Amino acid sequence: MKFSFSWLKSVLDTKADAKLIAEKLTSLGLEIESVEDASAALKSFRVARVLTAEKHPQADKLQVLSVDLGDGNPLQVVCGAPNARAGLVGVLGLPGAVVPANGMELRKSAIRGVESNGMMCSTRELGLGEEHDGIIELPGDAPLGTTFADYLGSDPVFDVAITPNRPDCMGVYGIARDLAAAGLGVLKPIAAQSVAGSFPCPVEVRTDDPEGCPAFYGRVIRGVRNGPSPKWLQDYLKSAGQRPISALVDITNYVMLGYGRPAHAYDVAKLSGAVVARKAREGETCLALNGKEYGLQPWMTVIADDAGVHDIAGIMGGEHSGCSDETTDVLLEVAYFTPANIARTGQALALTSDARGRFERGVDPAFLDTGLDLLTSLILEICGGEASEVVRAGEPPLARKALAYDPDLAGNLGGIDVAAAEQKRILGALGFDVADDWTVAVPTWRPDVAGPPDIVEEVIRVHGLDAVPSTPLPRADGVAKPTATPAQMLERRVRRAAASRGLHEAVTWSFLPEAEAARFADGEALWSLANPISEDLKVMRPSLLPGLLSAAQRNLHRGATSIRLFEIGRRYLRGAGGASDEKLSLAVVLAGDRIARGWASGKAQPFDAFDAKAEALALLAEAGAPVDNLQVMGEAGPQFHPGQSATLRLGPKQVLARFGMLHPATARAFDLDGPVAVVELFLDRIPAKKGAGQFARPHYAPPALQAVTRDFAFLVDASVPAGDLLRAVKGADKQAIVAARVFDDFRGQGVAEGQKSLAIEVTLQPVDKSFDEAALKAIADKVVAAAGKLGAELRR
């Protein structure tokens, strides 16, 4: 909200300067966006008198002026203004000055062969109005040589960010009230005298919609002259960013911006019958003042007469009943509209206005008569005329909230001990009535004050938030305990591990198109949003993979050659009773080239299912899963390639992860070309280890003795998974065998049909003493025996 310093001083008797006002407003919670001083741009322009004006020798529409700055050294200036003449006092821009309207820097130059040492300026060029038919004409006694900024005087414009909870500050008077309470001046009483009507109101005014419009007041003023408004009024409106239109319109805008009271003026000659606040009817429309026609719904409140709708109530007036220069009789409307109804109507019509911004926050219901008196007295003063009696339809909600308050709450809640007398002074200055028993009556213009904590806020912000004492937080002795939960620590661990493996974290939408979500639902019920941000994002994700696949597609289509993305987040399923069931997951997408083409590597190598498996096992290990006990089994899901995917399970039913190549049909659905490897870890299913909540890892002591490796080659049925054989070998001697890995899988010559040869490297770690041959043979026998339980034979 914008207003000038002079406007503020018209309602606040203060000696504070603009800087102090701006600082105090911010400390009161009315944050200053900017303070603009238009006169600052006029310091390079001077008051000057035209001594002579002669015709330009080379141009019919130009004159050569001799201009005096009062120093006895006239300057030659070429000017094309039709009103330039000898004796005129105007404004001269000297070389080096910057024209506010267009940013042009003035220079000494030759115009059609005649030297010009500056420019005589118009109102528009100086950014002071729209007049540009001639140069500015100042009074003849204006002091020559004075900067135009000093001649005009400084009138800074404040731009204040009003929060939604402060409708009382949507007018200059409300802001002045806060400043007065803070000690920066004395609030002037509202200069509104009650005007008695000299004749009955000729227009019937009523409300047929007490829910949307509880109170509707009106009066007619006849015999008005609707010309331009006075300069002081135009200056106020310009400072607020408003364009002066006519006296009647400008007066209603002045009362709205100055006192937070929107009103509307109708041309009586354009009305037909009674003016009624009612619900809109099916199929009705309104051509608003912005030139757009709006279709109305039956629950919307409108102002209408016998001919139809004239006004979208509380938001914008209609075009065909507005006032013009020919208006002689005017109907003033001052009403109270229900805030929720105004907000709903504005949202439905996508229509904003200054009036809507005030009505939907809540205007003062007790200000109807005062606001109407203000409008009437200003119109009679500026436009003349004769006022009718006031017609009052309905009753505004005038009941004031009474709150039981304890002044000790200022210290308990606000942290400042404010004397009871000072609290009573502050509240009184803000319009609150405080009884002896500290029952506080809330003013009608403060709908945001609902309880004692709100009263504390009023006291503290006016007393000064800078008065809150600085108190250090208490520190506990010793080392502070970690505050992260085990789930948070797990998430951090896995995130660091993924990043350390060269994966790039992505954060994608939790909402998905329904078709994408359905591909990953796996029989679970999808969880749809009742009010989605768009129709394409109305389903919560049942998996993190769709979002990552879309991100991979966008990156590949923009030239990326190797995609290594991961995301940690929650998948959303429909739980019992239709509630959301959120589960922590991690997903990885590998696409493009695993190894780029090069002279050493040859052709580019794509990612495969084993890359996905390696990522899954590494991340599960970091998450604390017992990877040595996991079984590799199929049935990863229809989204995966059936022959190049698997699951990692703890037992036959507990799936901790699934990995593998994406099914070609799924890849095509996401517009992905080439092989794509994916991983999905279900972090919520990983069993918690003892001490999982501890931050530090257990102490690691490196072995004192050297490890020993032994290789075994087993002939086994081709249907036996290598992982099963590897797990059997590891379990042969859990104390001595610390690692085992498959390093060869051979099928062909020398191996019977239906069999395969698996070569396994086993790492043995002595503890107390080195292994001798007997110990090594005993361990080897255990390994062979364990493998034999799966039908494997040692290959000779």
Curated annotation (Swiss-Prot):
**Cofactor: record remark:** Binds 2 magnesium ions per tetramer.
GO CC annotations on file: phenylalanine-tRNA ligase complex
**What are the protein's UniProt keywords?**
Aminoacyl-tRNA synthetase, ATP-binding, Cytoplasm, Ligase, Magnesium, Metal-binding, Nucleotide-binding, Protein biosynthesis, RNA-binding, tRNA-binding
| Major site of localization recorded for this protein | cytoplasm
Locate the B5 domain: which residues?
398-470
Taking every annotated instance into account, which residue ranges of this chain make up the domain tRNA-binding? 39-149
Location within or outside the cell: Cytoplasm
Protein name as it appears in the record:
Phenylalanine--tRNA ligase beta subunit
